[in-house]
Amino acid sequence: MTVAEMERALESLGRQLANRGVSADIVMAGGAWMALVLGAREVTKDIDAYLAPPTGPVHQAIHAVAQALGLAEDGLNDGIKGFFFREPPQTLWREFLGLRVYAVSADYMLALKIYAARGSDTADAVTLIRHLGLRSVEEVLALVEQYVPERLLTVRHRYFAEGCLEEAGAS
């Protein structure tokens, strides 16, 4: 999805919700956050968002928007909820009729990327490390530990952070 497609999908979701007589709050993260909030990329495969309860009406509206705009059924999804270990720091990014879209903070976004530690997250993690001005693996891991339970962090996360720092030119 391009930035324009994501914005159109969110606006359409808000209209769908308003037409159903409901409003909703979502918290955006992932590639959509990198594109829409940070402006660090032009496209992403989907919009990852945490949906505030009740989610039933939101899921119905998402389905209607996906059909109307020809988007994949998971084009806007709440799969990220499994990575929210505590409520993330967030700010209102944009408000549409029927929909308020919040964005996680940059440090929370980096914590998610380091925790996921996927090769596909490297470029985003490098961008976030530079954006946040982090210079050491200790700084990165201390930030991650603010949001991810320490017991879930392994040496893999440290190595991923070290690799990202090196690529960012910070180590």
Question: Which role does the model predict for each range below?
Answer:
Residues M1-S171:
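Compositionally biased terminal segments of proteins
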